């Protein structure tokens, strides 16, 4: 086998990207082999199968397929066998087991796997964006965010941002500090996607005090001083009033999930 090129044909009713990644992961376990991968995408009719097999027969190899339509899968198996080709079904056994486990039949809709894969990558991109734009990082990217959260330190900006990111939204957050102007970019983006966060001062004092304790800091300073916290929150309220397009949410008695749900409902409807 070493030194000779082998051909592997991937038949998919969608793009074939997912099955190719699975194949490449498997091939990584084989050293000193040469394989050329041919992706046959959007195989959804009898004609598609017969046409693709004509190409396969020019340089025969193994056929690996993920066709959720049972009739098309059977046709491919029969045609492959008739031409002396090895054919491996990557999805039927999985669908059968899941159908038995859940007690329901699969939808057999081509492309669903690709749609799920696309959604997964959307979430990955959203998380990556959100991490890179946490706590005021790179304000130049605010225009690319789906939502921009603003608020004082420890007002749930980061956990709320990450929760939304895992739902596929690109989120940036900007800390509001009295005496320091927010970045100019904040006022240049679509003002309807900005969310101002508020929190009860007593609750914020409690959160910040615990934070300092966990960091081993005995001195509270202005960070955990009630009057200073009131000043910070008053500054936020004044800023929010000057920007009436911003959505304002009080996170005091809300879970991250509840706050995220309101943002999505009010800004995406």
Curated annotation (Swiss-Prot):
Q: Which InterPro entries match?
A: Kinase-pyrophosphorylase, PPDK_reg
Q: Does the keyword Transcription regulation apply?
A: no
Query: E.C. number, please?
Result: 2.7.11.32, 2.7.4.27
Q: Indicate yes or no for the key word Nucleotide-binding.
A: yes
Tell me a Gene Ontology molecular-function term this record carries: ADP binding
**Sequence positions that bind ADP:** 151-158
Q: What class of enzyme is it?
A: transferase
* Source superkingdom: Bacteria
Chemical reaction(s) catalysed: N(tele)-phospho-L-histidyl/L-threonyl-[pyruvate, phosphate dikinase] + ADP = N(tele)-phospho-L-histidyl/O-phospho-L-threonyl-[pyruvate, phosphate dikinase] + AMP + H(+); N(tele)-phospho-L-histidyl/O-phospho-L-threonyl-[pyruvate, phosphate dikinase] + phosphate + H(+) = N(tele)-phospho-L-histidyl/L-threonyl-[pyruvate, phosphate dikinase] + diphosphate
- Keyword field: Kinase, Nucleotide-binding, Serine/threonine-protein kinase, Transferase
Return the HAMAP family for the record. PDRP
NCBIfam families (UniProt xref): PRK05339.1 (NF003742)
Query: What job does the chain carry out?
Result: Bifunctional serine/threonine kinase and phosphorylase involved in the regulation of the pyruvate, phosphate dikinase (PPDK) by catalyzing its phosphorylation/dephosphorylation.
Q: Which family does it belong to?
A: Belongs to the pyruvate, phosphate/water dikinase regulatory protein family. PDRP subfamily.
- The identity of this protein, by name, is Putative pyruvate, phosphate dikinase regulatory protein
Q: From which source organism is this entry?
A: Geobacter metallireducens (strain ATCC 53774 / DSM 7210 / GS-15)
